[in-house]
A protein has these predicted regions:
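A cytosolic small-molecule/anion-sensing beta-strand core signal
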Residues: 21, 49-50, 65-66, 84
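Short acidic-glycine-tyrosine-enriched beta hairpin
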Residues: 58-74
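Short, conserved beta-strand element in jelly-roll/cupin
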Residues: 29-30, 39-56, 91
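Conserved short histidine dyad/triad with adjacent acidic residue
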Residues: 10-11, 24-40
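A short, N-terminal "cap"/entry segment at the start of jelly-roll beta-barrel domains
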Residues: 1-26, 105-114
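Short, charged/polar surface micro-motifs in flexible loops or helix N-caps
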Residues: 22-24, 31-33, 52-54, 61, ...
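Ligand-binding loop in jelly-roll beta-barrel domains
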Residues: 74-102
Length: 114
């Protein structure tokens, strides 16, 4: 079964699929505009499985397509967006909040295993 099918219904969902040492591997599906945020203590990696992610930075936008990846350096403010949606694998250290340094209605307190 496709792990993405186990995620909650909706435009935004995250699920934990693996841990390695102090890192978590998560799957994410997203459509729309996320919030501006940063991760002050860690880099963040997105590997796009399906669709297109537009990573917004204050000085530019980077389009990341299926089969491509992007690493967001620690401390860099960014805002993911996707008009038609994307599915991705997200790699970051264990316990990193999904909204980084910002609390919002998009913050997920505990990401569940799928």
């Amino acid at each position: 079964m496709d792990k993405f099918e186990k995620l909650p219904v909706g435009d935004y969902a995250v699920g934990l699929i693996a841990k390695m040492n102090d890192y978590e591997f998560k799957i994410v599906k997203f459509k729309g505009d996320f919030i501006w945020h940063s991760h002050p203590d860690t880099d963040e990696t997105f590997i796009i499985i399906e669709g297109t992610l537009v990573m917004n930075f204050h000085d530019r936008k980077v389009e990341v397509n299926s089969g491509e990846m992007i690493v967001i350096p620690k401390g860099v403010e960014h805002k993911p967006s996707s008009e038609n949606g994307y599915k991705a694998i997200l790699i970051e250290p264990e316990g990193v909040p999904n909204t980084g340094n910002v609390q919002s209605d998009m913050t997920i307190e505990k990401i569940q295993w799928v």
